[in-house]
């Protein structure tokens, strides 16, 4: 393996990508997990909205629950019912309930987002290895991956939050993907995802980042809902999502994974000119 240093910078090409799962490659709109979080809070006599459940998407299950419980609206609802803020014991109990139900739910949302198979083929045609990271646990992925494989997608590496010391926004899943794929340096890799947590994960790992504005959690609409939406309203929402990604530090934005092979060609040009992420 060739070694690169500051005196001998890497000038491309991109050799590996790390793709998110729900909202990036499967489950258009990232619909699958939401009902589980809503039901788990309901089991504790607390009614949360889909928007409150969606906001922390991309984090590990326990971190997702902690983020929900820190939200002022959710914390207030919990205190109104229980007389005190949710404790770590409460969060742990809810996390176990989420894991018990989520594995079966996400397996029912294994349909590939349109264009994923073609995009992955195009990336592999450029000599790029396909990694992936997810806030789901390995037990959950054991339910999801076989269904996704039947639909034509299998990454070269799958790393779960439960496989590393901490999930997003920490970089450990990206580093483990780099090891699994045998790709170095990190400037030769691109993180692609549909949440701000994905962008922060990639930046913390020293990678290029692409945020997806149409197919994922930030827009949060099914393919049918997107088709039915007024085009001007859709553009307004996507512009807002793009701005959130830019504010988080994303190098590029795209509507979906199908657009990313062209973006990566642009990244190759930047690398050839001596640019770094």
From Swiss-Prot:
S-S bonds: none
Residues forming coiled coils: none
GO biological process: DNA repair; organic phosphonate catabolic process
Pfam families: Hydrolase
Cellular component annotations (GO), alphabetically ordered: cytosol
UniProt GO molecular function: phosphoglycolate phosphatase activity; phosphonoacetaldehyde hydrolase activity
Family: Belongs to the HAD-like hydrolase superfamily. PhnX family.
Stated name of the protein: Phosphonoacetaldehyde hydrolase-like protein
């Amino acid at each position: 393996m060739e070694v690169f240093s500051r005196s001998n910078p890497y000038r491309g090409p991109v050799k590996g990508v790390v793709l998110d799962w729900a909202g990036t490659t499967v489950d258009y709109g990232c619909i699958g997990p939401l009902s589980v979080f809503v039901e788990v809070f309901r089991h504790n006599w607390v009614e949360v909205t889909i928007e409150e459940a969606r906001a922390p998407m991309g984090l590990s299950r326990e971190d997702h629950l902690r983020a929900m419980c820190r939200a002022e609206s959710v914390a207030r609802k919990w205190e109104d019912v229980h007389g005190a803020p949710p404790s770590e014991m409460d969060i742990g109990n809810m996390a176990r309930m989420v894991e018990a139900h989520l594995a079966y739910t996400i397996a029912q949302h294994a349909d590939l987002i349109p264009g994923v198979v073609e995009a992955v083929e195009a990336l592999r045609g450029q000599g790029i290895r396909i990694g992936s990271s997810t806030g789901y646990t390995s037990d959950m992925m054991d339910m999801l991956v076989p269904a996704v494989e039947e639909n034509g997608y299998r990454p070269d590496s799958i790393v779960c939050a439960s496989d590393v010391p901490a999930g997003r926004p920490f970089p450990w899943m990206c580093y483990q993907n780099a090891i699994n794929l045998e790709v170095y340096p990190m400037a030769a890799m691109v993180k692609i995802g549909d949440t701000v947590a994905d962008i922060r994960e990639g930046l913390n790992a020293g990678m290029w980042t692409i945020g997806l504005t149409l197919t994922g959690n930030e827009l949060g609409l099914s393919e049918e809902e997107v088709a039915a939406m007024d085009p001007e309203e859709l553009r307004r929402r996507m512009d807002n999502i793009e701005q959130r990604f830019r504010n988080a530090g994303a190098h590029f934005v795209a509507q979906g994974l199908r657009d990313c092979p062209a973006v990566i060609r642009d990244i190759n040009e930047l690398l050839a000119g001596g640019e770094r992420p």
